[in-house]
């Protein structure tokens, strides 16, 4: 009887886990092979975008005067994002590797939110933090937000020295909802600059 109860409980837990997550993955494995990019900004912070897998994919890159370890510690602290990335007003940790992120949008635009599952990977040359949108029973869609159902991104950190790191952030620039298409490139430029500045501000 005890064995049956344990097995039943284990099965129920497994089923809840399976049915609470549905992954819609955008892979950035081949993004570095893309040859055609549209340059938005070519300064200390470089920002560009391209179509990849049917989505507008954006990338911001900059060399920051901080160690890889210090930058990685900021990126992986998802619960602290509202204190780092100023457009994020709330995060909810749903599971060890799943988080619900809520964004404030400027002016008359509807706020956005997304639920992502993330993973970290480190090699001798780089540190990566990638994420993709998932569905989760504890974070149903809310009419106060436009759900970014295809949210995806990749942080890539490459050390240039012990105290300098090349930071690259690639993300799906799709904003959905009521966001005007003519303003997308301006929004990507703003986001690309803000993300780098906020990382630097958090470490100064």
Listing of model-derived features with the role each one plays in the protein:
Residues 48-49, 99-106, 131-133:
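Short beta-strand segments that buttress and anchor functional surface loops
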Residues 2-13:
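Bacterial N-terminal signal peptides that target proteins for export
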Residues 25-26, 37-39, 113-161:
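Hydrophobic-ligand binding "helix-grip"
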Residues 71-72, 81, 118, 167-169:
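Hydrophobic pocket/interface hotspot
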Residues 77-116, 120-122:
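Mid-length scaffold segments of soluble, non-membrane domains
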Residues 23-96:
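Hydrophobic ligand-binding cavity/cleft-lining segments
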Residues 140-147, 173-194:
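A short acidic/glycine-rich loop-to-helix N-cap element
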Residues 18-19:
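N-terminal signal peptide c-region/cleavage motif recognized by signal peptidases
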């Amino acid at each position: 009887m005890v064995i049956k109860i344990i097995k039943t409980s284990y099965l129920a837990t497994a089923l809840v886990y399976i049915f609470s997550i549905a992954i819609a993955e955008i892979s950035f494995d081949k993004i570095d092979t893309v040859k055609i990019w549209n340059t938005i900004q070519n300064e200390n912070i470089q920002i560009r975008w391209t179509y990849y897998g049917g989505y507008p994919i954006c990338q911001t890159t900059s060399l920051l005067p901080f160690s890889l370890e210090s930058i990685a510690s900021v990126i992986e602290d998802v619960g602290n994002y509202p204190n780092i990335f100023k457009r994020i007003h709330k995060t909810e940790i749903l599971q060890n590797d799943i988080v619900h992120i809520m964004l404030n949008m400027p002016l008359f635009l509807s706020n956005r939110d997304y639920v992502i599952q993330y993973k970290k990977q480190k090699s001798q040359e780089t540190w990566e933090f990638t994420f993709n949108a998932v569905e989760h029973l504890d974070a149903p869609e809310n009419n106060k937000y436009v759900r970014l159902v295809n949210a995806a991104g990749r942080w890539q950190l490459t050390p240039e020295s012990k105290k300098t790191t090349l930071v690259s952030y690639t993300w799906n620039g799709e904003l959905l909802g009521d966001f005007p298409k003519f303003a997308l490139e301006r929004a990507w430029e703003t986001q690309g600059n803000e993300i780098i500045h906020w990382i630097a501000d958090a470490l100064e």
